[in-house]
Amino acid sequence: MGPRSPTAALLVLLCVGCAPTPGRGQYERYSFRSFPRDELMPLESAYRHALDQYSGEHWAESVGYLEVSLRLHRLLRDSEAFCHRNCSAATPAPAPAGPASHAELRLFGSVLRRAQCLKRCKQGLPAFRQSQPSRSVLADFQQREPYKFLQFAYFKANDLPKAIAAAHTYLLKHPDDEMMKRNMEYYKSLPGAEDHIKDLETKSYESLFVRAVRAYNGENWRTSISDMELALPDFLKAFYECLAACEGSREIKDFKDFYLSIADHYVEVLECKIRCEETLTPVIGGYPVEKFVATMYHYLQFAYYKLNDLKNAAPCAVSYLLFDQSDRVMQQNLVYYQYHRDKWGLSDEHFQPRPEAVQFFNVTTLQKELYDFAQEHLMDDDEGEVVEYVDDLLETEESA
């Protein structure tokens, strides 16, 4: 008995209306390289003006500035990712003279070099020549709040196709919003509404994944592999760009010691980075795809197996087990591959996880470990145990 198919294939119901359709809309004029000069303005100013116009029931003006603010947010996000991606390999600082134990100097030397690179990069990009938005405004965009206002403004402007798309885009982030669900029920009662249900923030890897699963369910193994092998690196690219965008500007509110201040900033960055995987996970048929990266490897290993390509199937199986070591189905698949290794000419290298899987697993695991440590040991002083005497402090440290 050969390897078994991923059960996810039975759960992902890919109807025509559920398939992510690339949403253009407000991004038709968007270009990272040549953003329209007439639209360059501070993101927060554009967003606040849009909401003011919304409150005044000036629907056309509100729509215009909400759409501009969405493009400005994407420009800022893409600009952050561009600079951090290009400066991630900044030339390391030369080793200082003295003992090799000066690791701290080398560390901060690298930090200074990277800061220099980022400063130069940002000086050349228009997104950073504007005043930067507050954290609360950025949070609104991450949670797709502008679409809540857009759908009603579109509706009042009698642009039902865009209202339907905006409502759907918002609901994907807020599936329990009762008012928006009622709005969507009304929209769905209209003739032809299904044609306009699309995610305006969909990513290319989502469409590729849906196509791959459809081909898989139709037993078109080569097509499924082709699309899934495109979806995987496309998702990872978006993931690492999301991590980079988390390293943007920060509001400094507290006056703290040097290391505590650095730790506070880094924990805030970690909070953002840990959310990246969840934020980027596709929502299909109203449900997020669980363990998205692992699921792609599950589909790949079975499709490769169906083509008798065990040299590619085995690494996908091992990659999947990085993320779910207790999965009995995949364990059995791996036993099958091991048993037939001589027949298929498999060597030890075919039973190693793929490099991109290892990198993704290591990054996400280490980020979670660091964040958990910070949550446990770097809480506010008023939440932790107060130690009054030095002897008590030393005893506490020794027991730890």
Swiss-Prot record:
Glycosylation sites noted in the Swiss-Prot or TrEMBL record: 86, 362
Signal peptide: 1-25
Family: Belongs to the leprecan family.
Assigned keywords, A-Z: Extracellular matrix, Glycoprotein, Hydroxylation, Secreted, Signal
Compartments in which it is found: Secreted, Extracellular space, Extracellular matrix
InterPro entries reported for this sequence: Collagen_mod_leprecan, Leprecan_dom, TPR-like_helical_dom_sf
Protein name per its UniProtKB record: Cartilage-associated protein
Function: Necessary for efficient 3-hydroxylation of fibrillar collagen prolyl residues.
Organism domain of life: Eukaryota
